[in-house]
Curated annotation (Swiss-Prot):
Belongs to the eukaryotic ribosomal protein eS25 family. Keywords: Ribonucleoprotein, Ribosomal protein. InterPro entries: Ribosomal_eS25. Residues 1-36 are annotated as: Disordered. This is Small ribosomal subunit protein eS25. PANTHER family: 40S RIBOSOMAL PROTEIN S25. It holds the Pfam family Ribosomal_S25. Residues 12-25 have a biased composition (Basic and acidic residues). The keyword tRNA processing does not apply.
């Protein structure tokens, strides 16, 4: 009837080590993003190299959606949407149809 026995010190130390390692792993996961290149900031800077790749893809296809662009450039869909919006402002592409979810862009030629 004496009650539960205390756990040995080695068991407590092992548990503390495990918890510390798990916290380190969680912090490392938070530091990296899905692509590994982009930071977690909301501002997306589109470099000239990416724009050249997009323009080459536009020459191959007549219709482009954010999904098709994101799969070919290996970027997220939100980044692809921003790229297409920027190209529309520049006059490189035109919006064919726009839905509440997707937009279909046509190469302006």
């Amino acid at each position: 009837m004496g009650g539960a026995s205390k756990k040995p010190i080695s068991t407590v130390e092992k548990r503390m080590k495990k918890m510390a390692e798990e916290q380190q792993k969680k912090q490392q996961k938070r530091a990296t993003t899905k692509t590994g290149k982009e930071l977690t900031s909301k501002n997306v800077v589109i470099d000239n190299e990416t724009l050249k790749k997009v323009q080459e893809e536009l020459k191959k296809e007549t219709i482009v959606t954010p999904y098709t662009l994101s799969t070919k450039l290996n970027v997220t869909i939100s980044v692809a949407k921003k790229i297409l919006e920027e190209l529309e402002r520049q006059g490189v592409v035109k919006i064919g149809t726009k839905d509440r979810r997707t937009a279909v862009y046509i190469a302006a030629s």
